């Protein structure tokens, strides 16, 4: 039985809620609605398409802005009336130019889960590749090559260990931040990402 035929369309009056989640960071990006046609088009094109209740037509996210949502997977909930759609967003998801439509909490404050921040930091560091070495420390690291970046990772690893053995928790946090920063730079230098690391951890966990 296919996903489309498994959904209880009668229960949802022909429109199933689709929660859109960043496949890498796990951040919830937006909520949309799909009818059968929108879901079929999403599965066929691998770009998320909704049914627009205001325009009363199919609407592919990013069709005018270019900020499309590249489909990674779709899961149906236990009641067969809600979809979890995991995507790789191309550009900001919200029409306000923010990564997610859920940036503000009930009090208007902007909160970011730690893993979401790491993902955003990774994107910033990735964008420094090929930049003028004098424009930033990160760009200068990339310019000096893999050997220097690897050396920095090693140095920071030693400093993390020394901070831990000395019992200085504040220093341990600072040195750990330096280590993670340089590790992300090294991964990017090698054409890898934090997602590759987390996938390996998940693979080991599931054994």
Swiss-Prot record:
EC number in record: 3.5.4.19, 3.6.1.31
Phosphoribosyl-ATP pyrophosphohydrolase: annotated span: 118-207
Annotated stretches, region: Phosphoribosyl-AMP cyclohydrolase: 1-117
Principal location class: cytoplasm
Subcellular location: Cytoplasm
Pathway: Amino-acid biosynthesis; L-histidine biosynthesis; L-histidine from 5-phospho-alpha-D-ribose 1-diphosphate: step 2/9; Amino-acid biosynthesis; L-histidine biosynthesis; L-histidine from 5-phospho-alpha-D-ribose 1-diphosphate: step 3/9
Keywords of this entry: Amino-acid biosynthesis, ATP-binding, Cytoplasm, Histidine biosynthesis, Hydrolase, Multifunctional enzyme, Nucleotide-binding
Catalytic activity: 1-(5-phospho-beta-D-ribosyl)-ATP + H2O = 1-(5-phospho-beta-D-ribosyl)-5'-AMP + diphosphate + H(+); 1-(5-phospho-beta-D-ribosyl)-5'-AMP + H2O = 1-(5-phospho-beta-D-ribosyl)-5-[(5-phospho-beta-D-ribosylamino)methylideneamino]imidazole-4-carboxamide
GO molecular function ontology, one term from the record: ATP binding
Family, similarity comment: In the N-terminal section; belongs to the PRA-CH family.
Alphabetized PANTHER family for the sequence: HISTIDINE BIOSYNTHESIS BIFUNCTIONAL PROTEIN, HISTIDINE BIOSYNTHESIS BIFUNCTIONAL PROTEIN HISIE
Name assigned to this protein: Histidine biosynthesis bifunctional protein HisIE
Organism: Photobacterium profundum (strain SS9)
Origin organism lineage: Bacteria, Pseudomonadati, Pseudomonadota, Gammaproteobacteria, Vibrionales
Encoding gene (name): hisI
